[in-house]
Design a protein with these regions (language model features):
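Alpha-helical transmembrane segments of integral membrane proteins
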Residues: 1-58, 344, 386-392
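Intracellular coupling helices
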Residues: 1-3, 283-324, 378-391
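Membrane-helix entry/capping segments
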Residues: 2-14, 239-276, 295, 340-365
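Hydrophobic alpha-helical transmembrane segments of multi-pass inner-membrane transport and secretion
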Residues: 10-36, 264-298, 326-327, 364-371
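Membrane-proximal extracellular/periplasmic loop immediately following the first transmembrane helix
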Residues: 35-117, 145-147, 211-212
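"Rare, low-scoring activations can occur
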Residues: 67-79, 156-160, 177-267, 344
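Hydrophobic secondary-structure segments that place a key small or acidic residue at a functional site
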Residues: 111-202
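Transmembrane alpha-helical interface segments in multi-pass membrane proteins
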Residues: 277, 298-341, 357-360, 364
Length: 392
């Protein structure tokens, strides 16, 4: 009978140890997922994402008057024309344009670049940092008269991929207007990222083309946001029938955050599973401690008669269960590391798996286990030893 009970007890402890492994692993994974999500939301993207409002006009012409009108408001810092925000955010779905140029050796080279439609105020509105050259000169008159020389600004990723020390003044061809015009590089901006940080920043160029600028991007002061939006809406409605009738706006920061909706859903699901795993593990601890104290009531009574303190008896039980947490911690760490290593590998830009996350997972389980064990054993350890022996 004793051997059978011993085997049964060993099996129960083994199952509890497995539950500890699962709980610690999930805690570790949850911590890293939340750390990565925080990293994604706070990483410097090379642009100003806060307080930029985007409005769909439905038309690319008759907007200059509207632009000048809203700039009269001191809370409106900058206004630019551009494409729809989701076009920038989903740029990674496009293959981009193949642009060609002649290098210093007189040989033709080419590079695939993403096109970002912009006007002369785009760099200022989004806070892009101009490293070399000058900004775009958006001249609608010259564009439609056929005298526009198509200046473009490239990002640093494009400059590095072109392997040219100074690209300012270089002519490139291809992309929009293939076979009809050449483009001239007038500036280089620091890399900026509209897309998800799952992918590296791609070579890109900014170019003015009025037909592609159906949205207005407005940089507003952080103070009096609603008041400024009401003012913009009033001026927008005064533009009827040139604009679409419905005034719709979105904040650029909100649109960017939607890039990581998948990660937020994953973090919520993982948190729910982690809580469930911890609860199940603690229920196992609770049940096992209850069974153990009942089986060892006589032992506890004898220890008390021989002078043992209640605290010492509780400590004995705590050390026993902490031992199982420690054993579970050993396989949980490499398991959590492997799972998260493969998950983080999906991101071009990622956080680090800090040592304190591993330690924290083990300490949380150890702490909850201690509270559960103390809560269950203190009552038994504190009762009169005569009563314990009589119970036996």
């Amino acid at each position: 009978g004793g051997q059978k009970n011993g085997k049964k007890g060993g099996l129960i402890r083994g199952l509890l140890c497995v539950q500890f492994v699962i709980a610690i692993t999930l805690l570790l994974c949850t911590g890293i997922v939340f750390k990565q999500l925080n990293y994604l939301q706070n990483k410097d993207l090379g642009l100003e994402k806060e307080n930029v409002v985007s409005i769909y006009t439905g038309l690319w012409y008759n907007v200059d008057g509207f632009k000048q009108e809203i700039l009269k408001n001191p809370n409106v810092r900058s206004v630019s024309m551009g494409a729809e925000i989701t076009d920038y955010l989903e740029g990674d779905k496009s293959q981009g344009d193949v642009l060609r140029w002649t290098d210093e050796r007189g040989e033709t080279d080419s590079l695939r670049m993403m096109c970002i439609w912009a006007d002369g105020d785009f760099v200022n509105t989004f806070g892009l940092k101009l490293l070399k050259g000058e900004g775009l000169k958006a001249d609608g008159g010259a564009y439609f008269s056929g005298t526009y020389d198509f200046p473009v600004i490239i990002n640093e990723a494009a400059r590095k991929a072109m392997k040219v020390a100074d690209p300012i003044g270089m002519e490139i061809s291809g992309g929009f207007g293939v076979g009809t015009n050449k483009k001239r590089i007038v500036g280089v901006v620091q890399d900026f990222n509209f897309q998800s940080l799952r992918q590296k920043i791609k070579p890109a160029y900014l170019m003015y083309s009025p037909e592609c600028l159906g949205n207005i991007h407005i940089k507003i002061a952080p103070e009096h946001k609603q008041e400024t939006l009401n003012f913009i809406q009033k001026k927008f409605e005064e533009m009827a029938p040139f604009f679409i009738k419905e005034f719709k706006y979105k904040f650029f920061s909100d649109a960017l955050n939607r890039n990581y909706e998948q990660e937020r859903q994953q973090s919520r699901m993982l948190l729910a599973f982690t809580i469930l795993a911890v609860v199940i593990a603690m229920m196992g601890v609770f049940g096992l401690v209850t069974l153990s104290t009942r089986q060892r009531t006589k032992e506890i009574g004898i220890r008390k008669v021989n002078g043992a303190h209640s605290g010492g008896i509780v400590k004995m039980f705590c050390l026993e269960y902490l031992k199982w947490v420690g054993i579970a911690f050993v396989p949980a760490c490499p398991l959590g590391y492997l799972f998260m290593y493969h998950w983080l590998d999906e991101f071009a830009y990622r956080t680090t798996m800090s040592w304190w996350l591993f330690l924290g997972g083990g300490l949380i389980i150890a702490g909850i286990t201690l509270l559960t064990v103390i809560g269950q054993t203190w009552r038994t350890a504190s009762q009169n030893p005569v009563r314990s022996l009589r119970y036996e």
